[in-house]
C-alpha cells in the first residue's frame, strides 16, 4: 500500500526573524533567536506525530530572517522540503511585512517572546497587522509571563498554543492534494452523500474520485485481489471474529455453508475497498497494473443502501474493520471509510483522525432518552437524560473501550500505542450479527459492541447550508455505563445487532447546551463522528484555518484559538467567527 516516505511527509517550517540592522544589533540577537527556533523544533519533534506514528520533522531556515531576501530564501527552502505550515519566532523587533510568510495557503503562526530587553511583542503586533491587512490570517502566540532574555524554556501557555497550532496545521497540510473516493452515489437521499465537489476543492484542497459499486463486484468476480491475503484474512476471521445473535426469522437465516460464503465475500470486499483507496502493488504482479495504483484516497465512502445491499452483502464488516486499528495484518493506522457515502461525516472522521491518530466512531444520533422515558420503559431513573449513538457500519472496534491507559482506565489509543493484546480484546468484546433481512436483503454482518462508560468523547459534524457553506458543530462529553438490564431493554427495542455508545454532553446551561435534549434538538444531521478525548478546541482551530465557522460548541472561551484577524470582526466569538470566515473565504478558492 502507498505510504508516505520520510522525504515527502509534510514538515513544519520554523522561521527565526531578527532585527536586520548590522554593526551590533543583529549580531547581539543571533544566538537568542536561533535558540528560540531550536526550542520550538525540539518541542514539536517530540510531541507531534503523523497518523502513522512517526514524529514530525521541523525545518529551520538556513539563517535568521532580517529582510525580504532572506524571507524569500526561506520560502524557497520550505518548498523544496515540503513544508506545509510555518511558525515564525522572534525575541525582538523585526521588519514586519518584509519578514512574514506570504504563502496564502500555508497555516502560519508567530511567537513573539515576552521579554523587556527587546520588543518581541511589538514585532508580533506589527507582523499580525500586516497579515490582517494582506488577507493572510496568522495565529498570535505570546506568553502571559515576562521571561529573562537568556531563558530558553517555553512557557506552558505558549507550548499549548504551539502544539494546538501544529496539530491543526499539520492536518490541513496533510489532507491537501489527497482524494475522497465515492464508491457509489447517493444513499437513500442522505444529504451528506450528495458529494459537494466545491467544498472539497475550495475548503480542503482535495479532489473527488468516483467509482461505481459495480467495480467491487467486478473485482470479486474476476478475482482482482491478493488471494494469499484473502486466505490469511479468512483464517484470522475464523479464529477471532465471533458470530452474534441472529434476530431474523428462520426462513431468512443462513445455513453454515451460506454463512461461510458470506464471510468470504465481506472479507474480499474489505480488501478490495482498501485497494481502491490506496492501491496494492501485489495487483501489478497479477497483471492489474492500473488497479494496483488506487485512487490516492485519504478517505472514502461506500453507498451500500440500497442498490448494493438489496442484492449483495452490506458494508458493515468492511467499514468497521477498515476504520479500526487492527486486522489480519496486525496493528496499523485506520483507514477512513464512511457508511452510506456520507462524505461530510467522512471529513469529520478525517479531522478527528488527523488530530489524534485514533480510530473514529461513525454513528447515528439516534435517540434522546429523557429521565422520564427511561424510567417508564425500564423502571430505573438515571441522573440525567442521554443520547443513544448507534449505527450498523463504520464504528471502529476501538470504540469498545478495551484499550487501557496507564491507570488501567478504558480509552482509545492511537495505533502506535495499541498493543496486540488490546486489539484482540476489542475483537473479543465484539460480536458479528447477521444483518437484519428486512433492511439488508443481501445479508451482511454487523458489529455488535457496547462502549465502556467514563470515556471522554467529542461528537462533531460538518453540515452544508445553502448560501452559507460548511459549518461545524461540536459537543464534548462522555460515554456512560447503564445497568445491564437497562441497556438490554433500551438496546433491544432499538437494534441489538449494532454497536452502541451511550453519550452525555457537557452542559453549559444555555443555548444548545441548556440540557441534553437541546443538544439532540440542535444537531444538524442524522450522523455524527465520535472522536476520543475532548478535542473541541483543536477542531475549532482547524476549522478557522479552513474558514469553516463553528455554529455550536461547548468549549471554554479561554481555549478558543483562532487567527488574530478574527479580533477585528467584533467581540462576540461565534458571530466574529462567521464574519471572518465569510470575509476571507475558503482557504483554496
From Swiss-Prot:
The gene is fucI. The keyword Magnesium does not apply. GO terms for cellular component: cytoplasm. It holds the Pfam family Fucose_iso_N2. Disulfide bonds: none annotated. This is L-fucose isomerase. It comes from Haemophilus influenzae (strain ATCC 51907 / DSM 11121 / KW20 / Rd). The lineage of its organism: Bacteria, Pseudomonadati, Pseudomonadota, Gammaproteobacteria, Pasteurellales. It comes from the Bacteria. Belongs to the L-fucose isomerase family.
Amino acid at each position: 500500500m502507498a505510504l508516505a516516505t520520510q522525504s515527502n511527509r509534510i514538515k513544519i517550517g520554523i522561521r527565526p526573524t531578527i532585527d536586520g540592522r548590522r554593526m551590533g544589533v543583529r549580531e547581539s540577537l543571533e544566538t537568542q533567536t536561533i535558540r528560540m527556533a531550536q526550542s520550538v523544533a525540539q518541542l514539536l519533534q517530540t510531541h507531534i506525530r503523523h497518523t502513522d506514528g512517526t514524529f514530525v520533522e521541523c525545518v529551520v531556515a538556513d539563517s535568521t530572517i532580517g529582510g525580504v531576501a532572506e524571507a524569500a530564501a526561506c520560502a524557497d527552502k520550505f518548498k523544496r522540503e515540503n513544508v506545509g505550515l510555518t511558525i515564525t519566532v522572534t525575541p525582538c523587533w523585526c521588519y514586519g511585512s518584509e519578514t512574514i510568510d506570504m504563502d496564502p495557503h500555508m497555516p502560519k503562526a508567530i511567537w513573539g517572546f515576552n521579554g523587556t530587553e527587546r520588543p518581541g511583542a511589538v514585532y508580533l503586533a506589527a507582523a499580525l497587522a500586516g497579515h490582517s491587512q494582506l488577507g493572510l490570517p496568522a495565529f498570535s502566540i505570546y506568553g502571559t509571563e515576562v521571561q529573562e532574555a537568556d531563558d530558553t524554556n517555553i512557557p506552558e501557555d505558549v507550548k499549548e498554543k504551539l502544539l494546538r497550532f501544529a496539530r491543526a496545521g499539520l492536518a490541513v497540510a496533510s489532507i491537501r492534494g489527497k482524494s475522497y473516493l465515492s464508491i457509489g452515489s447517493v444513499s437513500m437521499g442522505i444529504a451528506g452523500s450528495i458529494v459537494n465537489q466545491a467544498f472539497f476543492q475550495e475548503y480542503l484542497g482535495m479532489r473527488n474520485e468516483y467509482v461505481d459499486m459495480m467495480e467491487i463486484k467486478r473485482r470479486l468476480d474476476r478475482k482482482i485481489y491478493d488471494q494469499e491475503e484473502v486466505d490469511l484474512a479468512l483464517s484470522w476471521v475464523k479464529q477471532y471474529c465471533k458470530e452474534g445473535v441472529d434476530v431474523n426469522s428462520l426462513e431468512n437465516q443462513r445455513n453454515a455453508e451460506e454463512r461461510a460464503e458470506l464471510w468470504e465475500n465481506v472479507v474480499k470486499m474489505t480488501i478490495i475497498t482498501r485497494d481502491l483507496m490506496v492501491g496494492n502493488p501485489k495487483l501489478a504482479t497479477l497483471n492489474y497494473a492500473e488497479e494496483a495504483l488506487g485512487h490516492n484516497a485519504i478517505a472514502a465512502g461506500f453507498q451500500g443502501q440500497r442498490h448494493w445491499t438489496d442484492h449483495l452483502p452490506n458494508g458493515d464488516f468492511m467499514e468497521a474493520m477498515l476504520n479500526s486499528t487492527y486486522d489480519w495484518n496486525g496493528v496499523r493506522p485506520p483507514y477512513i471509510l464512511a457508511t452510506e457515502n456520507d462524505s461530510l461525516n467522512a471529513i469529520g472522521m478525517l479531522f478527528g483522525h488527523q488530530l489524534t491518530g485514533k480510530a473514529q466512531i461513525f454513528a447515528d444520533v439516534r435517540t434522546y432518552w429523557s429521565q422520564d422515558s427511561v424510567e417508564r420503559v425500564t423502571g430505573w431513573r438515571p441522573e440525567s437524560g442521554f443520547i443513544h449513538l448507534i449505527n450498523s457500519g463504520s464504528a471502529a472496534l476501538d470504540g469498545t473501550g478495551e484499550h487501557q491507559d496507564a491507570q488501567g482506565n478504558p480509552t482509545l489509543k492511537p495505533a502506535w500505542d495499541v498493543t496486540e493484546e488490546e486489539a484482540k480484546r476489542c475483537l473479543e468484546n465484539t460480536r458479528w450479527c447477521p444483518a437484519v433481512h428486512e433492511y439488508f436483503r443481501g445479508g451482511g454482518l454487523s458489529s455488535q459492541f457496547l462502549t465502556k462508560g467514563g470515556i471522554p468523547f467529542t461528537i462533531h459534524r460538518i453540515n452544508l447550508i445553502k448560501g452559507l457553506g460548511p459549518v461545524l458543530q461540536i459537543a464534548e462529553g462522555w460515554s456512560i455505563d447503564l445497568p445491564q438490564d437497562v441497556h438490554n431493554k433500551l438496546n433491544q427495542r432499538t437494534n441489538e445487532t449494532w454497536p452502541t455508545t451511550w453519550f452525555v454532553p457537557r452542559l453549559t446551561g444555555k443555548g444548545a447546551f441548556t440540557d441534553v435534549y437541546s443538544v439532540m434538538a440542535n444537531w444538524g444531521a442524522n450522523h455524527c463522528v465520535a472522536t476520543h478525548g475532548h478535542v473541541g478546541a483543536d477542531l475549532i482551530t482547524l476549522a478557522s484555518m479552513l474558514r469553516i465557522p463553528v455554529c455550536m460548541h461547548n468549549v471554554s472561551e479561554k481555549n478558543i484559538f483562532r487567527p488574530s484577524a478574527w479580533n477585528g470582526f467584533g467581540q462576540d466569538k461565534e458571530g466574529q467567527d462567521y464574519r471572518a470566515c465569510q470575509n476571507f473565504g475558503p482557504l483554496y478558492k
